[in-house]
Amino acid sequence: MKPKFDGYATQYDAWFMENDNLFQSELRLFQRALGDISGQRVLSVGCGSGLFESMIDHSGIEGIEPSRDMGAIAQKRGVNVIAFGAIEDADLEENAYDVIYLNGSSSYMEDLHKAFAVCKKALKPGGRFISLDVPKESAFGFMYLLAKNLGTFDHPYLNGVMPQLPYPLELCSAGVWHSTEEKINVLKDLGFHDFDYCQTLLKNPMYTNEDVEDAVPGYQSGGYVAIIARK
């Protein structure tokens, strides 16, 4: 099966560059969730084009990416892509990583339990698991689900409420979209503990690119949410 992002790598990066304030807001959340990772072994699951990684010191970051188009760009940006494929099928070294994170990739995974279980097995005891993504229950989640089902952003239901430059429809349509509570429950079922949360994009979607937002604690209001838990 063709990976969902094959053929859309350039479009993905261009969208973030055109929505720079939104990108900077998500980047601040990304940086806050990761914290200081110097000297740690870190794995990015669904590393994409390595756009976010290119904005931080990513010398210790390894990546797994289903799309060869995206992964090739990540490699050029200095991410050590160790495998092309899905995390569910990955054969990772056990108890090897200090941090494993999914930045925007869980929304393209059908079986969260299987994916998160693979990550847990590869984490060191006490290692951190981080999931950053658009919650299904957020305004962005509703907008993407509606556009996916309508097959377009150009519809009377969405007129007057859309951002100027919405996320590419092809990528919305490929998404599964999970709620934050669903992800938390899966992680708890797997035995993760010491949960922490932070969020950004608190404005409605049509206003989120007006200003850069700082990440704030919690998960009940944001359009982009980080869940942090320990093995």
Name each region found by the language model.
Residues 1-37, 51-55, 70-73, 130-160, 201, ...:
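Conserved class I S-adenosyl-L-methionine
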Residues 43, 48-89:
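Class I SAM-dependent methyltransferase SAM/SAH-binding core
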Residues 88-100:
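A short acidic, Gly/Pro-enriched loop at the edge of an enzyme's catalytic core
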Residues 99-112:
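A short SAM/SAH-binding and catalytic strip from SAM-dependent methyltransferases
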Residues 113-128:
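A short glycine-rich, Lys/Arg-flanked "PGG" loop and its adjoining helix->strand segment in the class I
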Residues 173-197:
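Short alpha-helix
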Residues 190, 210-231:
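Core SAM-dependent methyltransferase catalytic element
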